Regions:
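A charge-rich, low-complexity, intrinsically flexible signal that marks solvent-exposed coils, linkers
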Residues: 1-35
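Extracellular/periplasmic envelope-modification machinery, especially enzymes
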Residues: 38-314
Length: 314
């Protein structure tokens, strides 16, 4: 019955020598043991179920706020503004961007104001989605963008088994559409740089260019979007003081593609980077809404240069 003390000499629990405390402890212990022994008073499965659900909810909440360094309410107005760019995407992504299957040509979106007949077609993987919407503010166009399905003719990818059929359908549509004069090709080239993909991807992309130019189309190729490989809004805000971080530009895969005479190239690097170094912020906008897709705000700036430099058909 010694007094319980910690190494510093302070009490860490009630003194068992005190009669009232001993009675209270005994009574509480008896109540707890009685409750646990009587299976009718509780359900072990129920307790396990509720604890499991509770832990799951706590884990989900923790994962949600972990990249933000806490609740958004704790962030400065500047950081909250930067974080809002995770939603800076094309407002017609759900309707005009494909993820699977083989879309009918009737599903290709016609974007742009007025009743003018579109002369521009944007064909690409998801890196064409924001550009297509932004460009439609300057000229009416038709678009067919498909996640992880680049405009590389006869290119087969395991992640998108219908890509090869989709691309053939797009090509047939373009070859038989006399109204389309300009075809803008966009892709996240780095995504197809693996040993098993790169050769067939490059060959397929060059085949697309060949077929289009042979049919008299004006082909415009957008090169690799500067991609830091980390979520840009989260990275910029997950620090004490917001600093416009820089990263190295990588267009290794794109440089393997041979562009033929008559094909126009638009270089993002020319506007978004200085040499081989690219900032995560451009004109006070995060360049990406995630780790590789161009933010809509920056896309709206880029399309002005695309139209000016490459003389798109009105």
């Amino acid at each position: 019955n010694r007094l319980i003390r910690c190494v510093c000499g302070k009490k860490i629990g009630p003194d068992p020598r005190n009669f009232n405390q001993r009675v209270s402890l005994g009574r509480n212990d008896l109540l707890i043991r009685t409750f646990l022994r009587n299976k009718k008073t509780y359900s072990r499965k129920g307790i396990f179920k509720y604890f499991t659900v509770s832990y799951f909810i706590i884990a989900c909440c923790s994962l949600a706020i972990w990249p933000l360094n806490g609740w958004s309410g704790r962030l400065s107005p500047q950081k909250e503004n930067i974080l809002s760019f995770t939603k800076d995407i094309s407002p017609v992504r759900n309707q005009c961007h494909f993820n699977d299957g083989v879309p009918e040509t009737s599903q290709y979106c016609i974007l742009g104001q007025g009743n003018k007949i579109p002369h521009v077609f944007v064909w690409g993987d998801s890196h064409g989605a924001e550009i297509a919407y932004a460009l439609s503010s300057l000229t009416p166009l038709v678009t067919a963008t498909y996640s992880a399905c680049p405009p590389a003719y006869a290119f087969n990818t395991e992640s998108r088994p219908d890509c090869i059929t989709h691309n053939k359908k797009v090509m047939n549509y373009l070859l038989n559409n006399k109204n389309i004069k300009d075809v803008v090709l966009a892709a996240n080239y780095n995504l197809y740089g693996s040993d098993k993909d790169i050769e067939s991807f490059v060959k397929g992309f060059e085949k697309t260019i060949e077929l289009l130019t042979r049919s008299g189309k004006h082909v415009i190729v957008l090169d690799q979007v500067p991609s830091p490989g980390v979520n840009v809004p989260y990275t910029l805000t997950n620090v004490d003081v917001v600093v416009n971080k820089e990263f190295r530009y990588n267009d290794k895969v794109f440089r393997k593609i041979k562009l033929t005479d008559g094909v126009d190239l638009f270089s993002y690097e020319k506007y978004l980077c200085a040499g081989e170094s690219c900032p995560m912020m451009y004109n006070n906008f995060p360049i990406s809404f995630d780790d590789n897709h161009l933010s809509l705000s920056v896309a709206k700036i880029m399309v002005k240069y695309i139209k000016r430099d490459l003389l798109l058909t009105e």
